[in-house]
Each structure stands twice: as C-alpha cells, then as structure tokens.
Amino acid sequence: MMGGQNVTWRTLLTWIAGVSLGFSTAGYADDRWTQAGEVLLYALPLTAATATYTLEDPDGRSQLVMAYGVTMSTSYVLKGLVERERPDGTDDLSFPSLSAASAFTSAAFIQRRYGWDAGLPAYLAASYVGWSKVYSDRHHTTDVLAGAALAWGVSQWLVEPGSASQFAVVPTEGGMALAFEVNF
C-alpha cells in the first residue's frame, strides 16, 4: 500500500482469529462460549505482538516479551506452590489462571503502550477469556482474578506508556473494530 492509506485491524484480526481457531482444540472447549474464549486467548498475544511490528515499536516488543515472561514464570511458580484443585477436578493446577495471566498481560500491554482506545477492547476480550474459564469449570473466579491482577501489576512495572494516538475504535456493520493507521 502506498500513499497515506490506512491499514485496518479488521483484516488482521480476521486472520488472527482464523489462525487462533486452530489452537482451540482442547477437549474442554466443547461449546461455542468456551471456544470463543480459546480463540481470544491466542488472538490477544498475537495482536499485541503484531502491533509492535506493524507500528515499528521495538522497545514495546521488548517490554511485551519481558512482561509476558515475568507474568507467566511467576504464574507457573505459584501453581506449583498453591496446588489448588480445578473446579472440574482434572488436576491441582488451578491457581492462578495462566489463561487469564496471558490474556491480561496482552490487554495491559496494549492499554499501557497504546492507550485506552486500544486497551478497552483488549480488556473486554481478556475479561471474556477469564469468564469462559470460569464458565467451563477450568478455574475458580479467584484464579482468574489472581492471574489478571498479576498480569496488570507486572505490566505496570515493565511497560512504559507509549503513543495513544495510533489506535481508534471504529464502528463496523457487525459491531466495532480496533483500527490503527500506518502511513507509507
């Protein structure tokens, strides 16, 4: 694309959702509500990472990797220490929710780095991921809240605020889309 044309996230998010759908094959993802949560679980970090490349933000990319690494490592350590049984009884690795930690790391990064116009939809998507884990009996509500709080705290610590002007929430025929502008 040449000239001041916009690159919208609608195409990007459609691609990410399609790729992510392939990851939602877990045995417990047996209904559409849970499957949608699985799609968003993978789409959020892919979206955050893609934004750092598309917006040519190498500092943000490094901060995303650090925040994700610290959040997930801490979550794994806590799982081993707490050993809380899942609501469905499958194992004792319920606390904290890695899914919530992953989704909320992405959302917190997007909000902190690119502002609330991009962050609010990301937080809504992350909240849906958390809700879907409680709905599917994979986690207790407190597991999800702990994963979300950990992710938010680590992101506040490691992610520097960036320019918020590159993102916008725009109406579409089917609802809303997250968009950003890149000039070539």
Predicted regions and their residues:
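Hydrophobic core of alpha-helical transmembrane segments in multi-pass integral membrane proteins
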Residues: A43-T52
